[in-house]
Amino acid sequence: MSEIILTPKEQPEVPLEAPNIKPDVFAGKSIDEIRNIQIMHGNEVVKLGDFFEVSGEPADSAADIKIIIDGDVYNTKRIGQDMTAGEILVKGNVNMYVGAGMKGGKITVEGNAKSWAGQDMRGGELEIFGDAGDYVGSSYRGDWRGMSGGVITVHGNAGNEIGEYMNGGKIIIKGDVNIMPGIHMNNGLIIIEGNAVARVGGEMAGGTIVVKGMIEEFLPGFKYLGVEKDIEVNGETFPGAYYKFEGDHAIKGAKGMVYAAVGCNGHIEP
């Protein structure tokens, strides 16, 4: 796999909008042509080379390209947006919308990611080794169709409304989450290995949420179905005992499932 290295010169106060940082756009271009790729700085069209040193070996196919961003890009948005193949490695933090609309390939962020990571994701893999902000794997504002495929893994904590309007795929949060994970969820799987503050699965109609930690406050619209051990969801087994709830029956005909670890959630057992 050919590696193209982007070294940030300086992160400006006004964020960069850089959906063109992806293998699909770099494919078939020389290093000089990559330097001249357009990105946005506020309302101004600028060149990638104005803000990044560019080096490495180009390739003709997106699937054969790995983009390495060798530094912190905390004020660069939309990296990897709509990408279909190849890899991106970010050796630092990223701003909003990393991997939004992603359809294939892999993005790895070694630091933190701000809100809307993996928004409207269709496929591929997004892995964040730090924390993520709000709306991981959510829908576009005003839409009712969120993430429908792919896998998002956050090794740290995440914020509010992860998996909002989720329609498929899988989200794994290895730390804690804030309020309303899985709100309006229709399909897919959310795994929370830490704790959740409140309103898990609010107005969900389908899909599955597994919480291995504590749910501090649970919604009343879920029907308690008892305790299950070593549950299996989509071919994946979760050892241990879980309280099983169906809902959210604030939605007519809801068939969503929430599993909460027995050892942490005696306070929500009916």
From Swiss-Prot:
Pathway: One-carbon metabolism; methanogenesis from CO(2); 5,10-methenyl-5,6,7,8-tetrahydromethanopterin from CO(2): step 1/3. Residues 80-213 are annotated as: 7 X 13 AA repeats of [GW]-X-X-M-X-X-G-X-[IL]-X-[IV]-X-G. Keywords: Methanogenesis, Oxidoreductase, Repeat. Induction: By growth on tungsten or molybdenum under anaerobic conditions. GO terms for molecular function: formylmethanofuran dehydrogenase activity; transition metal ion binding. It is an enzyme of class 1 (oxidoreductase). Its EC number is 1.2.7.12. Belongs to the FwdC/FmdC family. This is Tungsten-containing formylmethanofuran dehydrogenase 2 subunit C. It comes from Methanothermobacter thermautotrophicus (strain ATCC 29096 / DSM 1053 / JCM 10044 / NBRC 100330 / Delta H). The gene is fwdC.
